[in-house]
Amino acid sequence: MTDKNPLVLAFVGDAYWTLYVRNFLVRDSSAKAGALHLRANKYVCAKAQAAFFQTLAPVLTDTETQIAHRARNADSHTRPKNCTLAEYKLATAFEAVVGYNYLLGDFKRLENLFDLILKEKQLC
């Protein structure tokens, strides 16, 4: 899986993280869809993902760190709209690590990583 293009890993990781956040918010909420959408956007935007990556960086495996490094340095030909380039690159690294673990089928690892984020950032 480490030979996959890091931007492909980020593409998958972004989708999985978005679904995870939406599921998390819906589980314990009676809010309407519009309100849930606004809350979810706070956690799937590049600024938030960059902060989440910094929370996870110290506990990443060597392989995850290499994937994050490759993703950060990949040229996506897309420029950020609502964040800095540095935040965008960290968000891409976060998404790539998520995508890597998702494609490996390592859902236990994803749960552990997401638990760290939820604990640190109080998602809800």
What kind of region is each of these model predictions?
Residues M1-C124:
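Double-stranded RNA-binding/processing signature
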